[in-house]
């Protein structure tokens, strides 16, 4: 057992020794501030170009505390103290806050929020691609209440569109881009109640293949929802949980192939080797399903079978950028959320770091002159780190103090609730007796729950590129797709962009017409 006095002594030592020498000089901070000021002054000249391309990065569950902790982790992975590190999203010039509540929930879920930031309207928790007039699980409240997404608006404008996720492709976030469902959990017809089936509602995997048949790129997990029940998985032949789930007997991957024009090149791949062997210049449509369910955590990923998020984004962009009219790409770092729900902060933060790497990859492959990039989260988590940790303290390490009550140490990372509530012999578990640096270590929580919960605070929105300045303050979450559509002249925002197809240069005044005068009918 670690002595409380030793913990405090170590903390004092680290505080003195981890201050970089250059930071002891006031001129370092003054020069840094002046450089930042100089860059800020350049922003007075706003980028009012048309956004030919729009990329939306969605970190599921990536609240501000997660962003900060991921920043420190990224720096420490590069052998720095961490706090001074800049994430790729930190480099974006415009930042806003998004209010995440659902129409019926103070603390939201990922389905209602996805409907907000993709379809432009707030909705009830647990529903996707429908207005708040639809009640969760009630199929008969769906018809007539469907709302379309920015992915649909982009496709209708002749742009290429893509979805890349580390979850299953029919999970909450991606499904709001193409589906209309009273329940986010209706992954296949196997998960639907008989009443919903009899009333004519379709499962989300079915809708993926039928609602917008020409989505150019789809990558993520979710193979088992595409195949008839008990169909053996190509990768996990002996795993019953990986087998097909569909009761209707449909092979949705074959159906996906049948919908593609014969003169186009469509490819289905199920592993990393096949994906990276593709020549994107000869791919028109791509479907990549790399796991039966969600993809593996980045720390657990098999380099032979599972591509990283960065690799999927690179392939997607090489395909989508061939369209001279531009593209819309939704990228989800979906397993940040799963790591937090399981209380596995190390998994969650490594997922966030990988998503940031994908953001950097996309930035290197596009230009701010014609590409609007937005990075945000759907909601936060009850994840925190603190305890007066010294500079350079491992983000997964101990705080330099002990509890006032049980005199035991604690990790800097803690959860408000979740599965990390551990009691040993009637007392809080002594973390010095366990491997708290393990990939699957569950950080301690204040309240015992099987799954840790979402947080209800605002989340950050980072933006760069054309019209990024429209994301500038505290906004309702459903405002985000209106900005993306306005910037790219799609959806309801066509009238002020009549010049866009003529090749003539826009005037800033034309692009800054009040949004209030625009008709919103095409959004719904």
UniProtKB/Swiss-Prot annotation:
It is found in: Cell membrane; Extracellular vesicle membrane; Mitochondrion membrane; Mitochondrion intermembrane space. Ca(2+) binds at residues 235, 290-291, 306. It is an enzyme of class 3 (hydrolase). PROSITE patterns: ALKALINE_PHOSPHATASE. The modification Phosphoserine is found at residue 110. Zn(2+) 1 binds at residues 60, 110, 378-379. GO terms for biological process: bone mineralization; calcium ion homeostasis; cellular homeostasis; cementum mineralization; developmental process involved in reproduction; endochondral ossification; futile creatine cycle; inhibition of non-skeletal tissue mineralization. Its cofactor is Mg(2+); Zn(2+); Ca(2+). This is Alkaline phosphatase, tissue-nonspecific isozyme. The lineage of its organism: Eukaryota, Metazoa, Chordata, Craniata, Vertebrata. The gene is Alpl.
């Amino acid at each position: 057992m670690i002595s409380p006095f030793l913990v405090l002594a170590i903390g004092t030592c680290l505080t003195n020794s981890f201050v970089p020498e250059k930071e002891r000089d006031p001129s370092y901070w003054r020069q840094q501030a002046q450089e930042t000021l100089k860059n800020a002054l350049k922003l007075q000249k706003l980028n009012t170009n048309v956004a030919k391309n729009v990329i939306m990065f969605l970190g599921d569950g990536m609240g501000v505390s997660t962003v900060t902790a991921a920043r420190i982790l990224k720096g420490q992975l590069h052998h720095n103290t961490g706090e001074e590190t800049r994430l790729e999203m930190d480099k974006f010039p415009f930042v806003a806050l998004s209010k995440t509540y659902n129409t019926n929930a103070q603390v939201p879920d990922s389905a209602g929020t996805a409907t907000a930031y993709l379809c432009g309207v707030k909705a009830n928790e647990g529903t996707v691609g429908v207005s708040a007039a639809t009640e969760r699980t009630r199929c008969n409240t769906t018809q007539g209440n469907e709302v379309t997404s920015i992915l649909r608006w982009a496709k209708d404008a002749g742009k290429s569109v893509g979805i890349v996720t580390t979850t299953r492709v029919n999970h909450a976030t991606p499904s709001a881009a193409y589906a209309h469902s009273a329940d986010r959990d209706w992954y296949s017809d196997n998960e639907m109640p008989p009443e919903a089936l009899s009333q004519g509602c379709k499962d989300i995997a079915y809708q993926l293949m039928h609602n917008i048949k020409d989505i150019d790129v789809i990558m993520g997990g979710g193979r088992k929802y595409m195949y008839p029940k008990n169909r053996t998985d190509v990768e996990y032949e002996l795993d019953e949980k990986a087998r097909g789930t569909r009761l209707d007997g449909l092979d949705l991957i074959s159906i996906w192939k049948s919908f593609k024009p014969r003169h186009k090149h469509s490819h289905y791949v199920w592993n990393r080797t096949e994906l990276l062997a593709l020549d994107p210049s000869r791919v028109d449509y791509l479907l990549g399903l790399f796991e039966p369910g969600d993809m593996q955590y980045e720390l657990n990923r098999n380099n032979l079978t599972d591509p990283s998020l960065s690799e999927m984004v690179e392939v997607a962009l090489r395909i989508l950028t061939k369209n001279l009219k531009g593209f819309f790409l939704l990228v989800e770092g979906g397993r940040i959320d799963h790591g937090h729900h399981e209380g596995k902060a190390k998994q969650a933060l490594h997922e966030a770091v990988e998503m940031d790497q994908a953001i950097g990859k996309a930035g290197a492959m596009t230009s701010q002159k014609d590409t609007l990039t937005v990075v945000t989260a759907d909601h936060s988590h009850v994840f925190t780190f603190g305890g007066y940790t010294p500079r350079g303290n491992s983000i997964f390490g101990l705080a330099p103090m002990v509890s006032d009550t049980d005199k035991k140490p604690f990790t800097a990372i803690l959860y408000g609730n979740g599965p990390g509530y551990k009691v040993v012999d009637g007392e809080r578990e002594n973390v010095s007796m366990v491997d708290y640096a393990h990939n699957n270590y569950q950080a301690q929580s204040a309240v015992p729950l099987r799954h840790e919960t979402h947080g209800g605070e605002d989340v950050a929105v980072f933006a760069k590129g054309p019209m990024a300045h429209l994301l500038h303050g505290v906004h309702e979450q459903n405002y985000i797709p209106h900005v993306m559509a306005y910037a790219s002249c799609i959806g309801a925002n066509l009238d002020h962009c009549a010049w866009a197809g003529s090749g003539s240069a826009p005037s800033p005044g034309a692009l800054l017409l009040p949004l209030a005068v625009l008709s919103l009918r095409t959004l719904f």
